[in-house]
UniProtKB/Swiss-Prot annotation:
Protein name: Protein OPG197
InterPro entries hit by this protein: Orthopox_B11R (IPR009754)
Description of what induces expression: Expressed in the early phase of the viral replicative cycle.
Family: Belongs to the orthopoxvirus OPG197 family.
Top-rank lineage group of the source organism: Viruses
Biological classification of the source: Viruses, Varidnaviria, Bamfordvirae, Nucleocytoviricota, Pokkesviricetes
Pfam families named in the record: Orthopox_B11R
Length: 72
């Protein structure tokens, strides 16, 4: 019984994490048009999300290059 409860809690936690990631992405897309005159702000938000996740989807050197190119 405890194993079932743990599995359900794990599933709920994973769903919550995925929901938060989706909400972040939606917020970025919604702000895209607002920030179109200020692209560095949009890029900064995207970099924060990419670097705050546990994934290695973006390399630190790439982030530094992007930050340098847009003057962040």
């Amino acid at each position: 019984m405890d194993t079932d409860v743990t599995n359900v809690e794990d599933i709920i936690n994973e769903i919550d994490r995925e929901k938060e990631e989706i909400l972040k992405n939606v917020e970025i897309e919604n702000n895209k048009n607002i920030n179109k005159n200020h692209p560095s702000g949009y890029i900064r938000e995207a970099l924060v999300i990419n670097t705050s996740s546990n994934s290695d989807s973006i390399d630190k050197e790439v982030i530094e290059c992007i930050c340098h190119d847009v003057g962040i």
